[in-house]
Amino acid sequence: MANKIRVRYAPSPTGLLHIGNARTALFNYLYARHHGGDFVIRIEDTDRKRHVEDGERSQLENLRWLGMDWDESPETHENYRQSERLELYQRYIDQLLAEGKAYKSYVTEEELAAERERQELAGETPRYINEFIGMSETEKEAYIAEREAAGIIPTVRLAVNESGIYKWTDMVKGDIEFEGSNIGGDWVIQKKDGYPTYNFAVVIDDHDMQISHVIRGDDHIANTPKQLMVYEALGWEAPQFGHMTLIINSETGKKLSKRDTNTLQFIEDYRKKGYMSEAVFNFIALLGWNPGGEEEIFSREQLINLFDENRLSKSPAAFDQKKMDWMSNDYLKNADFESVFALCKPFLEEAGRLTDKAEKLVELYQPQLKSADEIVPLTDLFFADFPELTEAEKEVMAAETVPTVLSAFKEKLVSLSDEEFTRDTIFPQIKAVQKETGIKGKNLFMPIRIAVSGEMHGPELPDTIYLLGKEKSVQHIDNMLAKL
């Protein structure tokens, strides 16, 4: 095994980059960069049935958007896709066959299904039973000849050491061990189509690429003993393994599911909605790891410097969409205006709102944004029909002082000339209404805000009125007075 730390992220090109896979990539990336090691991308594309066109491009594109870079990948190195490494796998299959550590199995899917059904009915744990048990060499040869004559294509199975103990000290969970007798019998390392199974190919790849540490989700724990068997059969040293805990939905407490519609689970979704990649990177980094302390906002460089594998959580990581949005808002409101406007611009353009007021509108709503696509509904006031009031807003407008406030403020606006109507002259007009009527606080400001914008909350009221314009503001107030 290499002395230098070398880790890998090895996705299957079967769809979009999920938040769980993004976390796996990110933790490997942070670990490598913190220790001055190598971060390798390898594509595991041996499951041809689930292969999605453009799946590989999508994975790499979204990793790059998150801000990760890598030292080796299919983009720069040959044979970094499993489909390009079939000769290498075959070489080791042949070696294990020659050494008697693996054998060709001619049992059919129908026979396997029937045996599983028998075992389940008998209350036995399903397992593969070697089809050659009890056969003499002559009987074995006759059986193989008969099966091959019938056109049955064999798989290749690894001969499992039933008395073996397969254990490792996990980077996250500590000591874990499995008994060879609980693995389910001899298992397939090469399918009928000639492709290796995952648990075989991944060992060959990790050894060939000198991977020193394998950091992945704890759904892979059950795969680890099988992989250790292959390392043992080939006489190789295994890497260190670390299995991160599940990601659960913070609302349900259950494993995060693609059916959870209250969460954005694919990195592509965050890109399309105009989240800042730095915010998503920061949020994912804290799913099952934290550096200690109360601080939660970290740059990529800070996260690399702070990353400590000993602080990986042993408890499930809670995915909280509200926290993601809080963090995203923190990034957006503190980002430089040019970056935020660049994120908002495509959404404004698509909505036909890229007017001479566009920059002012983005500046106005920047403190509220959780994602750039929100700029369109937030600016409806300036482009769309006046919104219907909510019950809470109607309750505010039912107060007996509201007509007095609105009429007085309308008069103040009308009295301003076009030159006098500026952002800085609006607040003094509101204060003048307060002085004249004796009405103050939310009884003063809330009716004006609702009458002008149709909302109880929003940006600074003078900013909203100024961007809306004197004429439209007066029109909105007149319309509201007519409804009271």
Swiss-Prot record:
Domain of life: Bacteria
Gene Ontology cellular-component annotations: cytosol
Residues noted as binding ATP in the record, renumbered to the chain: K258
Key words of the record: Aminoacyl-tRNA synthetase, ATP-binding, Cytoplasm, Ligase, Nucleotide-binding, Protein biosynthesis
Localization, UniProt: Cytoplasm
Keyword Cytoplasm: yes
GO molecular function, one term: ATP binding
Record-level GO BP terms: glutamyl-tRNA aminoacylation
Disulfide feature: none
Classification via CDD domains: GluRS_core
E.C. numbers: 6.1.1.17
Presence of keyword Signal: no
Transmembrane annotation, as ranges: none
Reactions this protein catalyses: tRNA(Glu) + L-glutamate + ATP = L-glutamyl-tRNA(Glu) + AMP + diphosphate
Motif 'HIGH' region, residue range(s) on this chain: 11-21
Protein family membership: Belongs to the class-I aminoacyl-tRNA synthetase family. Glutamate--tRNA ligase type 1 subfamily.
Quaternary organization: Monomer.
Function as written in the Swiss-Prot or TrEMBL entry: Catalyzes the attachment of glutamate to tRNA(Glu) in a two-step reaction: glutamate is first activated by ATP to form Glu-AMP and then transferred to the acceptor end of tRNA(Glu).
Protein name: Glutamate--tRNA ligase
Record lineage: Bacteria, Bacillati, Bacillota, Bacilli, Lactobacillales
